[in-house]
């Protein structure tokens, strides 16, 4: 079982229950899934970029990504409906907790000029979205073997009803918010 899941059950959940005065243990907010998305506009001209991005996203997440396709044609971008334009992974369970642990303790501290993540990136429904400009902050990526530095979006979906509960949950789990 993931280390962070144990910490959540034994320490974080009781603190949240005490702070927000929940009547039922099912009301306590928890992580439900983490979505990693890599949108690649360059994949229109060169499909090989998409293959390397999918391989790297698979190394970061520990599971095979699904290729995302264009929903509609956009002539200005020379994009046709159904063309592959990115890849994504949805993490749940132990893999989700292990990824979150790695993100907070290993990857984010490796970001250049890192002073914490914005606490304003919550969406009002308890979900947090984080944009990363360089995927090389993850320890699985070998800097010598990559052809191009790519960015990604990380969406952390929680069962929290509002931003305050989600912010408290993520802060207790170790998310380094700006002061």
From Swiss-Prot:
GO biological process terms, semicolon-separated: translation
The keyword RNA-binding is annotated on this UniProt entry: yes
GO MF annotation terms: rRNA binding; structural constituent of ribosome; tRNA binding
Gene3D superfamilies linked: 3.30.1440.10
Annotated Pfam families: Ribosomal_L5, Ribosomal_L5_C
Keywords from the named record: Ribonucleoprotein, Ribosomal protein, RNA-binding, rRNA-binding, tRNA-binding
PROSITE patterns in the record: RIBOSOMAL_L5
Origin superkingdom: Bacteria
Any one Gene Ontology cellular component term annotated for this protein: ribonucleoprotein complex
PANTHER family: 60S RIBOSOMAL PROTEIN L11-RELATED (PTHR11994)
Family: Belongs to the universal ribosomal protein uL5 family.
Task of the protein: This is one of the proteins that bind and probably mediate the attachment of the 5S RNA into the large ribosomal subunit, where it forms part of the central protuberance. In the 70S ribosome it contacts protein S13 of the 30S subunit (bridge B1b), connecting the 2 subunits; this bridge is implicated in subunit movement. Contacts the P site tRNA; the 5S rRNA and some of its associated proteins might help stabilize positioning of ribosome-bound tRNAs.
Oligomer status and interactors: Part of the 50S ribosomal subunit; part of the 5S rRNA/L5/L18/L25 subcomplex. Contacts the 5S rRNA and the P site tRNA. Forms a bridge to the 30S subunit in the 70S ribosome.
NCBIfam families given in the database record: PRK00010.1
Annotated protein name in UniProt: Large ribosomal subunit protein uL5
Native organism: Syntrophobacter fumaroxidans (strain DSM 10017 / MPOB)
Gene name tied to this protein: rplE
